[in-house]
Amino acid sequence: MAVTNVAELNALVERVKKAQREYASFTQEQVDKIFRAAALAAADARIPLAKMAVAESGMGIVEDKVIKNHFASEYIYNAYKDEKTCGVLSEDDTFGTITIAEPIGIICGIVPTTNPTSTAIFKSLISLKTRNAIIFSPHPRAKDATNKAADIVLQAAIAAGAPKDLIGWIDQPSVELSNALMHHPDINLILATGGPGMVKAAYSSGKPAIGVGAGNTPVVIDETADIKRAVASVLMSKTFDNGVICASEQSVVVVDSVYDAVRERFATHGGYLLQGKELKAVQDVILKNGALNAAIVGQPAYKIAELAGFSVPENTKILIGAVTVVDESEPFAHEKLSPTLAMYRAKDFEDAVEKAEKLVAMGGIGHTSCLYTDQDNQPARVSYFGQKMKTARILINTPASQGGIGDLYNFKLAPSLTLGCGSWGGNSISENVGPKHLINKKTVAKRAENMLWHKLPKSIYFRRGSLPIALDEVITDGHKRALIVTDRFLFNNGYADQITSVLKAAGVETEVFFEVEADPTLSIVRKGAELANSFKPDVIIALGGGSPMDAAKIMWVMYEHPETHFEELALRFMDIRKRIYKFPKMGVKAKMIAVTTTSGTGSEVTPFAVVTDDATGQKYPLADYALTPDMAIVDANLVMDMPKSLCAFGGLDAVTHAMEAYVSVLASEFSDGQALQALKLLKEYLPASYHEGSKNPVARERVHSAATIAGIAFANAFLGVCHSMAHKLGSQFHIPHGLANALLICNVIRYNANDNPTKQTAFSQYDRPQARRRYAEIADHLGLSAPGDRTAAKIEKLLAWLETLKAELGIPKSIREAGVQEADFLANVDKLSEDAFDDQCTGANPRYPLISELKQILLDTYYGRDYVEGETAAKKEAAPAKAEKKAKKSA
């Protein structure tokens, strides 16, 4: 049934739609059979179709159109015959993905008059390969040739098993019918090849479209080029089908030193160099009313000369205009789609490229450009040209007409007769169109678990008296200069001497930086880094509790990489392996050894450090495995004289480390054992270590080991909101870190122990709320629960043990009792809550917090209240008044 009006077009679309639905269920084997049969038929009809195209359009050369038809069938088939376009394209068992191809549906194919049969063959074949249907809107000047090509492909496809209406066309094309087709609700994609107006209409249709831009290919010929090859290539390309290929050369820009030689070569091999009036006459005929004169498109050189009012030999290949102006006022500077060529002289290579840039920008941006040079010995020029040209195809030593369509002069450039020009040319793609552009890809993504890890220092030495023996490794490793980082108390009380005496006896030079204070600041860290830069140690030894170790770690970074910006070190991350800022490689200048003199922080084995910006008072927890010390020395002799308050705060810090690591979303079977063992040791030995001190060296040693074991657990499983809030409390009110954790931990447990939280933290391994169950497991492991206890009872017993332990260790019952003034706290609680939410530790908490929830935990902890889910401060304040009112009423 012929299509000559909108009603007939609608009927055609309905038939094609039905055919495509059926075709969408075909297997790859069925599709490939149809694809092959259609390609064979098109190749077999290459000559009659070429004759028909030239006869109807009055453009081009039969013999060249034969080549284009052959290319559109044979090369397209060869390139894509083995490409999977149906069903499952790929499966990745490692990452759990399946990629599935789906056809787009019905394609509207816009075909130009310059390539009426080859483009129809090409678009039909790639549509068949991808289980799509296609309806052609041919150019009126070549409609019969286009539709005949489509029909030949269709009949071959039907014979091979395809539905009968899979390919359709408009018999009497018009602007009205083209627009109706492009805007039809059942059209799923427009594949447009044609003039700028038609391509713009496609993109303006509101439909997904793949269109191509105009070409205005410039050619640069430099002084290293093979001139004979360059001229031969340009002539072959420019005369191919009388220049109608949109990639064909429109201008040559020749470096001055070889300009005359190139000009002479053109003149002696078929090029006609226009002079005087002839040049002006051709300039006048190229453009008509400011646009390309359709009368010259696809015509031989001698006919164009006749149109201009003079004659040239019939064997003239191209008309060459030697011009100087590179702007729209020069007709030769435009796309001409005919065997006419502009020739420019450039003073040098850079000038030639600059002229080529202007020519591309003037009318062929995004399409094609070409360079003739010594590609083997001029890689810098190839690179320079590639960077300067805003074209999707940058051809080197290649005839542009044949090279641009791919697979002829470079076998990685995809064969195509629809050449995308990217955003420069107003196109959606910047490559040669192929089957991959005509399928929708669905990705089935199975849930996968993140790779986890368990990272430790290379060596951990422990037991009483291990310090001097462990230091032997420093000597045997050949270290010559050691910087000890500590605080003034430890320095004045001879702790540093225990290290320097061993090292000096072995001939190791030592320097001590002892200005670290509690909550180390950036200014102190920078001062230590300056000392390191002048002393140039090959080993840095951190001696002390968390503060000296934190300071030493950051000094280490600044010493090894002075170019490092602290603001980047402190940047938050969601996944430590995917962070935007990558810590630099450490250990190039110096190794890091951590010797702990407190039992709590675990910093000797962790990738964490906390530093305070003294300009703002902001505390920054830093995290990266580059900060993990190379060696940790855990010698309990160094903590025998630790004061009771430090024992209590450090011990409860370690308890919190183990608790948070065990319920973290990153907890694993590797970290779980260490968290539980640390808690077991702390439950058994922390009270005795606190009360008896050095009189019970076993208890002190077990707590010291437990703190490091808990450090290993949270170094790998990370922490949670208890630490997030503790960091901010410590920074704002100068509450010791361990005390801040002790004040918060019970309410954090109450907050986390919820099987239906407001928000669950998103992490693949953490597939459901588990904190409640895991707190109960801790109670079981510590022997707190009785047989038959339910989860809630176990958690209450865990909380009761913690409250008893805190009371025994002299911990205040609230933040207010710890000395923070109410007005000061309330003035800062909103900022504390927001800053805690933004803390690096928050991301691993099992319950993803709302800022308002963190505020409630802080308020409840300040006043010594138990956190209760869903109860706000306002409700809690109103409860006593309500109870009193009720009591009066009943009385």
Name every feature range the model reports, one short phrase each.
Residues 24, 310-450:
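Conserved C-terminal structural/oligomerization subdomain of aldehyde/semialdehyde dehydrogenase
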Residues 1-98, 126, 268:
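N-terminal Rossmann-like NAD(P)+-binding subdomain of aldehyde/semialdehyde dehydrogenases
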Residues 452-539, 815-816:
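ATP/NTP phosphate-donor binding region
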Residues 732-735, 739-826, 843, 867-868, ...:
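Gly/Pro-rich interdomain helix-loop hinge
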Residues 88-229:
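Rossmann-like NAD(P) dinucleotide-binding subdomain of oxidoreductase/dehydrogenase enzymes
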Residues 3, 121, 199-327:
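ALDH superfamily catalytic-core signature
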Residues 260, 268, 605-717:
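Carboxylate- and glycine-rich phosphate/diphosphate-binding segment that chelates Mg2+/Mn2+
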Residues 78, 84, 149, 523-637:
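Glycine/threonine-rich beta-strand-loop-alpha-helix active-site module
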